[in-house]
Amino acid sequence: MATFQVAVADPESGRTYQFEVDGQDANRFIGREIGAAVDGGAVGLDGYTVEITGGSDDAGRPMREDVDGSDLMEVLLEGGAGFNPDEDGERKRVTVRGKEVSEAVAQLNVAIDEHGEEPVAELLGADGDDE
């Protein structure tokens, strides 16, 4: 059974809510890709739609939108998720995970895409990233 640490970003308020999702709710994310819309009920936001924006595995390797599948792959990067160059033109071969969510993913980042009728703070609790 898959278990994810999910960080839900609310672009309207600028707050982030973080909690663990497992079981049937976690299975709603399996097989989806970065950019895919998922029913917000999977993260406790009934009536909302959330978009998968990224994630990482248990070793901290980031998911990349431009790498197909869910496997690990060594890619030559010039920047972006997984590598921040110090000089212009610097490139580096880095191991990253593909854009498809699998059981190997430990953390998922999602953003609220469509808001429902009830406020987010009421559904998820008022304690966001200000702890």
Curated annotation (Swiss-Prot):
Domain of life of the native organism: Archaea
GO CC terms in record: ribonucleoprotein complex; ribosome
GO BP: any one term: translation
Ribosomal protein in keyword set: yes
One MF term in the entry's GO annotations: structural constituent of ribosome
Keywords for this protein: Ribonucleoprotein, Ribosomal protein
InterPro entries: Ribosomal_eS6, Ribosomal_eS6_arc, Ribosomal_eS6_CS
Family: Belongs to the eukaryotic ribosomal protein eS6 family.
Name of protein: Small ribosomal subunit protein eS6
Species assigned in the record: Halobacterium salinarum (strain ATCC 700922 / JCM 11081 / NRC-1)
Gene: rps6e
